[in-house]
């Protein structure tokens, strides 16, 4: 189990990372919940991915998450593959695994324990699905809406 203080630090890191380097996300409303040592985190996201410095946000998040690497394996699901190429060394150094959302599953679903949807308020959905592993339907990309998913899976502690 992750120490309570570290859990709070993780939430603050997520919040500051989401707002880092872009005015678009400054006033976002956040939903954070804990279930044991898993994190649920949801915030609204700007419609067009190319208008937001996603790479800068992810770099900040990866660097800050180095401290919790013994407690978490973090999986990042992102639609445009170009971000994976640029961030691959940084992601690897923090045990953050990248998966292209469109190629991750042949049946159109992404295996998930805790899914972090940006831009969409899914608090009622989380309330129902909070305590159990579940599968999340693929969210398709259109011209004005881009969704990408942070998948945070709690696995091995320092003592396991």
From Swiss-Prot:
Family statement drawn from the similarity comment of this UniProt entry: Belongs to the UPF0479 family.
Species of the source: Saccharomyces cerevisiae (strain ATCC 204508 / S288c)
Lineage: Eukaryota, Fungi, Dikarya, Ascomycota, Saccharomycotina
GO CC field: cytosol; membrane
Sorted UniProt keywords: Membrane, Transmembrane, Transmembrane helix
Protein known as: UPF0479 membrane protein YFL068W
UniProt topology in membrane: Multi-pass membrane protein
Transmembrane helix as UniProt keyword: yes
Superkingdom: Eukaryota
TM helices/strands, residue ranges: 39-59, 136-156
Subcellular location: Membrane
């Amino acid at each position: 189990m992750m120490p309570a203080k570290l859990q709070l630090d993780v939430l603050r890191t997520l919040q500051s990372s989401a707002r880092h380097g872009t005015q678009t996300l400054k006033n976002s409303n956040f939903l954070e919940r804990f279930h044991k040592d898993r994190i649920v985190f949801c915030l609204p996201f700007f419609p067009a991915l190319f208008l937001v410095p996603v790479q800068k946000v992810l770099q900040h998040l990866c660097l800050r998450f180095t401290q919790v690497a013994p407690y978490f394996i973090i999986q990042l699901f992102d639609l445009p593959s170009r971000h994976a190429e640029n961030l691959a060394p940084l992601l690897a150094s923090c045990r953050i695994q990248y998966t292209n959302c469109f190629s991750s599953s042949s049946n159109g679903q992404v295996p998930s324990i805790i899914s972090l949807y940006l831009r969409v308020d899914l608090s009622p959905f989380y309330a129902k699905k909070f305590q159990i592993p579940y599968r999340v339907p693929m969210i398709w990309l259109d011209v004005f809406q881009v969704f990408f998913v942070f998948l945070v899976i709690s696995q091995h502690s320092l003592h396991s």
